[in-house]
C-alpha cells in the first residue's frame, strides 16, 4: 500500500438518543449522534407494531376489480 494516502482510522463514540454509547473505529474522525440503535429500535426490542392499513386493500380491490361472471 502507498504511504500517506489513506485517511486516519480513529476511535470514536456513537451516542444514541436513548443514552446507549457505542465505541467503534471510523475514518469520519468525529463522534456521532444516532437517532436509533439496536437497544431502542422496535425491530430488535420486540416491540414492533403491525401497521393496519384500515381496509385499504379491500377498498382498492372493491373499486378496481372486474366483476366476476359467475
Swiss-Prot record:
Q: List the cofactors.
A: Zn(2+)
Gene3D superfamilies hit by this protein: Ribosomal protein L31
- Binding note for cofactor: Binds 1 zinc ion per subunit.
Q: Superkingdom, according to UniProt?
A: Bacteria
Question: Which Pfam families does the record match to this protein?
Answer: Ribosomal_L31 (PF01197)
Gene Ontology CC: one annotated term: ribonucleoprotein complex
Q: Which PROSITE patterns match?
A: RIBOSOMAL_L31
Quick one: which residues bind Zn(2+)? 16, 18, 37, 40
GO molecular function annotation = metal ion binding; rRNA binding; structural constituent of ribosome
| An example Gene Ontology biological process | translation
**Keywords per UniProt:** Metal-binding, Ribonucleoprotein, Ribosomal protein, RNA-binding, rRNA-binding, Zinc
Alphabetical list of InterPro entries matching this protein: Ribosomal_bL28/bL31-like_sf (IPR034704), Ribosomal_bL31 (IPR002150), Ribosomal_bL31_A (IPR027491), Ribosomal_bL31_sf (IPR042105)
Q: How does it assemble?
A: Part of the 50S ribosomal subunit.
The protein's role, per its UniProt record: Binds the 23S rRNA.
* Family note: Belongs to the bacterial ribosomal protein bL31 family. Type A subfamily.
* Record-linked NCBIfam families: L31 (TIGR00105), PRK00019.1 (NF000612), PRK00528.1 (NF001809)
Name this protein carries in UniProt: Large ribosomal subunit protein bL31
Amino acid at each position: 500500500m502507498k504511504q500517506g494516502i489513506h485517511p486516519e482510522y480513529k476511535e470514536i463514540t456513537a451516542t444514541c438518543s436513548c443514552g446507549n454509547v457505542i465505541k467503534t473505529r471510523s475514518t469520519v474522525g468525529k463522534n456521532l449522534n444516532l437517532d436509533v440503535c439496536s437497544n431502542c429500535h422496535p425491530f430488535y426490542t420486540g416491540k414492533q407494531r403491525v401497521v393496519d392499513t384500515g381496509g385499504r386493500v379491500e377498498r382498492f380491490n372493491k373499486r378496481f376489480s372486474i366483476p366476476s361472471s359467475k
